[in-house]
Curated annotation (Swiss-Prot):
Domain Rho-GAP positions: 113-301
Gene (name only): PIK3R1
Domain SH2: 333-428, 624-718
SUBUNIT field: Heterodimer of a regulatory subunit PIK3R1 and a p110 catalytic subunit (PIK3CA, PIK3CB or PIK3CD). Interacts (via SH2 domains) with CCDC88A/GIV (tyrosine-phosphorylated form); the interaction enables recruitment of PIK3R1 to the EGFR receptor, enhancing PI3K activity and cell migration. Interacts with PIK3R2; the interaction is dissociated in an insulin-dependent manner. Interacts with XBP1; the interaction is direct and induces translocation of XBP1 into the nucleus in a ER stress- and/or insulin-dependent but PI3K-independent manner.
Single GO BP term: positive regulation of protein import into nucleus
Species this protein is from: Bos taurus
UniProt protein name: Phosphatidylinositol 3-kinase regulatory subunit alpha
Amino acid sequence: MSAEGYQYRALYDYKKEREEDIDLHLGDILTVNKGSLVALGFSDGQEAKPEEIGWLNGYNETTGERGDFPGTYVEYIGRKKISPPTPKPRPPRPLPVAPGPSKTEADSEQQASTLPDLAEQFAPPDVAPPLLIKLVEAIEKKGLECSTLYRTQSSSNPAELRQLLDCDTASLDLEMFDVHVLADAFKRYLLDLPNPVIPVAVSSELISLAPEVQSSEEYIQLLKKLIRSPSIPHQYWLTLQYLLKHFFKLSQTSSKNLLNARVLSELFSPLLFRFPAASSENTEHLIKIIEILISTEWNERQPAPALPPKPPKPTTVANNGMNNNMSLQDAEWYWGDISREEVNEKLRDTADGTFLVRDASTKMHGDYTLTLRKGGNNKLIKIFHRDGKYGFSDPLTFNSVVELINHYRNESLAQYNPKLDVKLLYPVSKYQQDQVVKEDNIEAVGKKLHEYNTQFQEKSREYDRLYEDYTRTSQEIQMKRTAIEAFNETIKIFEEQCQTQERYSKEYIEKFKREGNETEIQRIMHNYEKLKSRISEIVDSRRRLEEDLKKQAAEYREIDKRMNSIKPDLIQLRKTRDQYLMWLTQKGVRQKKLNEWLGNENTEDQYSLVEDDEDLPHHDEKTWNVGSSNRNKAENLLRGKRDGTFLVRESSKQGCYACSVVVDGEVKHCVINKTATGYGFAEPYNLYSSLKELVLHYQHTSLVQHNDSLNVTLAYPVYAQQRR
């Protein structure tokens, strides 16, 4: 039997003070039985004003706790059918003062957050944090059609959920967990992030721009622009995209799970935005944005399901001239762990039928992505792996990725999808890359390196100047909006004063006319005109400020446009510069000479002060190779060490290693790939025959060529000093 109840959302964190209380975290959803309010003497309508009720007794749907919580800490959402609890009487009790928003955010971060920031959890080409991917995949596998998904609380308490989230992702097995526990862990994950998926700065901007936006579609375009701002890490946008895909998938089976776009947006917009100061009107705007994103954005992009493949024709080495027994690492078209952006670059302006294979961005072991050129566009096709078999869709019939690719080099992919009537004709070979370096002697190549590096630095400075203008203009726009709001309030006060004076002036003017007191009449009229004149001045000032704001908003958009136009040039210049640098490095050019061409101020060969290369501690692998140590142990080993101190360990990614190095006082981590061509940090730099050879090279070559934030060499093995 169900009873009528009410739903509330927590606006602030609250730490329970008595045994009968429950904790509140920002965004928690709570339900209160109507009968419990009636028993306390409250009538219909008062439920919408929890701050006037005082203390409420209810159920926290997010944490699974039941008890008392302060009405000043929550906002009313609406009515809901619930299972009736037994209300318990309680003596009168004073309410705590609701904290200010700024304090709440800080407290929330300290008390609730146990997860690192999204920018620290993953990096492109990954599409989302590994832990989030695991949770979503497990939920979709177990509960896609569950009619109580995300609305029924499991028996797990917050501490147990946090313990689950703290587990090592690689070894985490979610098969044993009930779907409702997984759903609670999913919501707890979103709550425990130090910053919401849609940052507060974006939410604030969305709400402040509300008067200028005409439709929800404009809101969505504005959201995309704000969250893609250079000041916000790209991981936030990727995570939002991943979550929207999950919500869309749920909404596709809403006839069974009852989770349509509206319900999902009401459930998750508080967790995605986490914006406590929004009015009910603004909250509805934010809910509507998520609803439209779920129901339209992904509905348009979702591809039609793939047709089941026909049984493959038997192929042999004899009749197709291809070797199905070749290892994947040796295949010229297999590029390993490269990003989608790099793939797009390699396939740009190529003929239909051009293809390559890379590791799938989901990082599920054995899954890959085939990227194929068709109709002038890149088509991404997932290669699945299960029970030792590979294929594009069930049933998986190929024994290896090589066998699968070789099959479709002879047969059209129309067997798999009628719209893909093309064969895999032209592999993009990792062994035959375009020869960017045309010059044939070291001095000539060095001069070209200097030219490209100079162009790159000029473009970088131009981009930095634009970014400073972009930030300054954004701040000025915000200040002008605040000033306009202040003008509006001032005008409102003056107009009210003017109306009051006008009302009373009529009475006094009539009185003074009867008395023949012309002086007082003139004084009243003068004061009234003075007040009207002041209002007119303020209105003019506001109008001028609004005109300035429009001009500055146009300038802001123009700066944004110019920044976006410079980005491709920056990427291309850096890529070309790095290829020249790699060519010179392979020819054995010393860092001193490279510094001269790169225009670095400190061109002295710092390594000439060190003993001969043979005396370097790097030759002893025990000084830097720590074996199967994990990320946390690596950070503990390197904490407090000087810049350039490093170690190499086995990576959680099978067959690879990780380098951990101190940069600007912080420990950074980067993957070392192991490929058919050798070890390296990225294609086409995977050239070193051993880890030792790679370490010796980067002992005098900066890692900055692979990552702008890693301007450091592998100078000091972590155990070197202890062994001296």
